[in-house]
Amino acid sequence: MLVEYEQETKSLVGVNPLRRTTITSARPALNGYQKCRCFYCFREVSIIQGSQAMADVDHFFPHMLKQCDNNKPIDGVANLVLACRECNRGENGKFEKIPTPDLLERLFNRNEYLITSHHPLRETLIAQTGLTTANRQHFLQDAYNCSIFFVGARSKKWQPVPQGDAIF
C-alpha cells in the first residue's frame, strides 16, 4: 500500500485504486524522527492542534513538481517533512524554492533512518523510493534534478539560518 498526504484532511491516507482510507495524521507520523523540530532550521515546533508553534507539513520538493513528472509521489511520505511556519511560509520561507544539496542529503538520511529502524512507514518509503539504498539515492537525485529543471536551474537554492541545535 502506498501512503500519500491528503491536503484537505491534513492526514496521511492509504492509496488504493478502489478506495482511500485515512491511516494516520501526518504530523505525528513525521514527528517520530524530527522530535518536535523543524526539518530545515531545527526550531522547536509542536504537533498539538492549535499550538502557536504548530508545525506545517511541507513538500520538500515543490508540489508543482507533479507537473514535471506524474510518477513522482510528491504527496508521499518520502517527500514530506515538518517545518516551522517561518521556513515553510515566512518572509524568507521556502515556498517553491529548491532546497540546497545539504538539505537533500538530510532528507535521504531521514528516509534511510526510518527504513532501517523498521518504522511503520518503512514499507511505504521503500515502495515510493526503491528497494536498495542506491535506488533510493537515485530516486531523490532524479526528483532533485527534475525540480531544478522545472523550477529553473538559475534559481538560488534555499537554506535557512539554523534556529536550534542540529539533532538529526
Region spans (language model):
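Intrinsically disordered or highly flexible coil/loop and linker segments, enriched in small
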Residues: C36-F39, G93, K156
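Histidine-centered nuclease catalytic patch
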Residues: F42-L80, G93-L107
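Short amphipathic alpha-helical segments
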Residues: N79-L82, P120-L121
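The −1 position to Zn-ligating cysteines in a subset of zinc-ribbon hairpins
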Residues: R37, D56, A83
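Extended charged
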Residues: M1-V15, F95-F168
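Cys/His-coordinated zinc-binding microdomains
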Residues: F42, R85-N88
